Amino acid sequence: MPAEIARRIAQGAGREPADLVIRGARLLDLVTGELVPTDIAVCGEVVVGTYGEYEGARVIEAASRIAVPGFIDTHLHIESSLITPHEFDRCVLPHGVTTAIWDPHELANVLGTAAFDYALQASTETAMDIRVQLSSCVPATDLESAGARIEAADLLPYRDHPRSLGIAEFMNFPGVVQADPGCLAKLAAFAGRHVDGHAPLLSGSGLNAYAAAGIRTDHEATGAAEALEKIRKGMTVLIREGSVSKDLAALAPLLTVATSPFLAFCTDDRNPLDIAEEGHLDHLIRTAIRLGVPPLAAYRAASLSAATAFGLTDRGMIAPGRRADIVLLDDLEACAVARVIAGGRAVEEALFAGRARTPAPGRGSVKAAPVAAEDFRIPGADGAETSVIGVVPGRIITEHRRLELPAANGCAGCDLDQDVVKVAVIARHGRPGMGRGFVQGFGLRRGAIASSVGHDSHNLCVVGADDADMAVAINRLIALQGGFVVAAGGTVLAELALPIAGLMSDLPFEAVRDALHPLREAARTLGCTLPEPFLQVAFLPLPVIPHLKITDRGLVDVDRMRLLG
């Protein structure tokens, strides 16, 4: 190490040629907002010189391109990209995302601590710097059947792992506010480490209590007033723009040069089609700027503010002594990524070739018995008021609606005129269980859509206008050992297998992307009006997001944290 420090000193002083020089860049100064012409000298994986001219063993001609720090995704579930972390690395790093903070919460709900073992090992095999936050709430609640339970004692062996930052989104915010002993044990075990938050709509004294527990970041703010209260109370708000949860438009007015130290970006859940068609954090940055956010504020949020919030003090700026994560842009406002340097290495296809790939665990994890059409019958009287999950497009928050539905032979049925169809969740972790209900807002006129991605316990979820097609879709999911299925007329119209824990494919990114096109098209032929139907299905079972959800145990009134009778 002393020899490496000596090399950095010599190269920074100009006494030796730098390992790498990026020549003729215009550096975005995150302190002043200026675009400053300069070379950038790199020794190993560290920047050693800026604001001058340097000689290097290797030279990249920037040709007046704009140099900005590498982007940091502050909270995501790589599983939601449906691909392995190695494929995620290959396809997202070229978008300028040089650091990702991964909560393997989805895998953990299926596999328990084996998910941490896999995530931590895989994070050593990627060119992107992937840091892991340990999933704090597995299961999220006791209102569903999960594949695992993780307590404070299970987290402790991973606390001091060099790839671990702390614990991930603390979803049991009522438990924190009420000083639940299990929550306190986890918070105490990770005192002094980063504790990430998850507190939708929490405010006032409840938010005071939550922040006082040492929780410093939150990505669940969906409105500017909510986000402002959180940053005023010392939290960093992670502005989320995923494939379903789209909060950027609502929060963009809050992101100014003055507030940018307290705001960062995250994707949470982003699928391969959106990555391919729109991008990743580069999409968030250009969208924010288009919405009126000053470019300096947007790029600060994407780098320096993110690094500061998570204690990653070795990155976030292009400055001597900082990690050489550098993005060269053709256009600042369009965030047009031309070239990426990650840890001092040029991002090229050769960078990913020949890397070790630890096999992903979790095959054979879908343990559910076949179902029949009659299993989806819901008792009810004609004209009786029924609780219905109301989908809010672009949100994972749902409404608790009370609607009159038709019934025949003692069973309530779909009402297509009101855009109401059935939804069911089937237990998949080896124990029987099935919750049934109704949902409004999918636009389905026929058929069924099913998914083994069902936050957070990842039981099987199906939305459908026909009981027989719902059975076809679920039974095909079981045969595939997880995935997405669209069925109508008694046949499968489109499918994608996700055999890794029922969550991820072992195929290349491009193959998964291409398989999603016919799935979306098949959903549209059923009448589905939602732009991302599969992730929308996946969030219907999430009983920690208001207001009405469904699990394998039935409908959940999230506001009261209880099952409906």
UniProtKB/Swiss-Prot annotation:
EC number(s) on file: 3.5.4.2
UniProt keyword annotations, A-Z: Hydrolase, Manganese
This protein's record includes keyword Glycosyltransferase: no
GO molecular function, one term: adenine deaminase activity
Reaction catalyzed: adenine + H2O + H(+) = hypoxanthine + NH4(+)
Signal peptide annotation: none
Alphabetical list of Pfam families matching this protein: Adenine_deam_C, Amidohydro_1
Coiled-coil annotated spans: none
Entries under Gene3D superfamilies matching the protein: Metal-dependent hydrolases, Urease, subunit C, domain 1
GO biological process: adenine catabolic process
Cofactor(s) in the UniProt record: Mn(2+)
Listed transmembrane segments: none
The keyword Metal-binding is annotated on this UniProt entry: no
Source domain of life: Bacteria
Family: Belongs to the metallo-dependent hydrolases superfamily. Adenine deaminase family.
Protein name per Swiss-Prot or TrEMBL: Adenine deaminase
